[in-house]
């Protein structure tokens, strides 16, 4: 490992006029490293996030379609209830004298129950959409945080080792010794 490090150190001392060399100054290259890591995270994370969001969008759209089908069924039931209402109204004309008030109550009950069912289905659809959106947002946040944390830990573990620490400490001790002399 020391030979490899020494070879990189010797590469860092190439003449700078018109040639390519390695910059071993950690403070000068840290900004470049961070920008490279962020660029890699954006480049590779974008596809994962878009796939995740597309899947979540499909689920939400499927939920909306299911809710719309339920709504269509409720509308169909409403139409059936209306036809029954018409039938009941025809019978009401025949029995107006005896049972008009009872028929009117039945009609109102049909309308109220159908209206209540439609409202419940609409509320269920809206709650499902909101829940799926919040769940998708939370999953995306968690995924981005995990990827950023893994990238940062990978960068730290690849950049730091014991030999580099010891060399940095020795260099700093040497500079402090030179300052105090």
UniProtKB/Swiss-Prot annotation:
Regions crossing the membrane: 27-49
Pfam families documented for this protein: ATP-synt_B
Subcellular location: Plastid, Chloroplast thylakoid membrane
Signal peptide segment: none
One of the record's GO cellular component terms: chloroplast thylakoid membrane
Keywords, sorted A to Z: ATP synthesis, CF(0), Chloroplast, Hydrogen ion transport, Ion transport, Membrane, Plastid, Thylakoid, Transmembrane, Transmembrane helix, Transport
Keyword Thylakoid belongs to the record: yes
Keyword Plastid attributed: yes
A GO term, aspect molecular function: proton-transporting ATP synthase activity, rotational mechanism
UniProt superkingdom: Eukaryota
Major subcellular site: plastid
Membrane topology: Single-pass membrane protein
HAMAP family, sorted: ATP_synth_b_bprime
Record's miscellaneous remark: In plastids the F-type ATPase is also known as CF(1)CF(0).
Role played: F(1)F(0) ATP synthase produces ATP from ADP in the presence of a proton or sodium gradient. F-type ATPases consist of two structural domains, F(1) containing the extramembraneous catalytic core and F(0) containing the membrane proton channel, linked together by a central stalk and a peripheral stalk. During catalysis, ATP synthesis in the catalytic domain of F(1) is coupled via a rotary mechanism of the central stalk subunits to proton translocation.
Family named by the database record: Belongs to the ATPase B chain family.
Subunit structure: F-type ATPases have 2 components, F(1) - the catalytic core - and F(0) - the membrane proton channel. F(1) has five subunits: alpha(3), beta(3), gamma(1), delta(1), epsilon(1). F(0) has four main subunits: a(1), b(1), b'(1) and c(10-14). The alpha and beta chains form an alternating ring which encloses part of the gamma chain. F(1) is attached to F(0) by a central stalk formed by the gamma and epsilon chains, while a peripheral stalk is formed by the delta, b and b' chains.
Name of the protein in question: ATP synthase subunit b, chloroplastic
Protein species of origin: Daucus carota
Gene: atpF
């Amino acid at each position: 490992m020391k030979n490899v490090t020494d070879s990189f150190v010797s590469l860092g001392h190439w003449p700078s006029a018109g040639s390519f060399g390695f910059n071993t100054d950690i403070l000068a290259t840290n900004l470049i490293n961070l920008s490279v890591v962020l660029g890699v995270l954006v480049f590779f994370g974008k596809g994962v996030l878009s796939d995740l969001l597309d899947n979540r969008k499909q689920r939400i759209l499927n939920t909306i379609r299911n809710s719309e089908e339920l709504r269509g069924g409720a509308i169909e039931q409403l139409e059936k209830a209306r036809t029954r209402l018409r039938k009941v109204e025809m019978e009401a004309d025949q029995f107006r004298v005896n049972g008009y008030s009872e028929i009117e109550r039945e009609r109102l009950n049909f309308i109220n129950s159908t209206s209540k069912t439609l409202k419940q289905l609409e509320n269920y659809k809206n709650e499902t959409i909101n829940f799926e959106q919040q769940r998708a947002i939370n999953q995306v946040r968690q995924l981005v945080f995990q990827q950023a944390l893994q990238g940062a830990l990978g960068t730290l573990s690849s950049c730091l080792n014991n030999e580099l620490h010891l060399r940095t400490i020795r260099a700093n001790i040497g500079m402090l010794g030179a300052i105090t002399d």
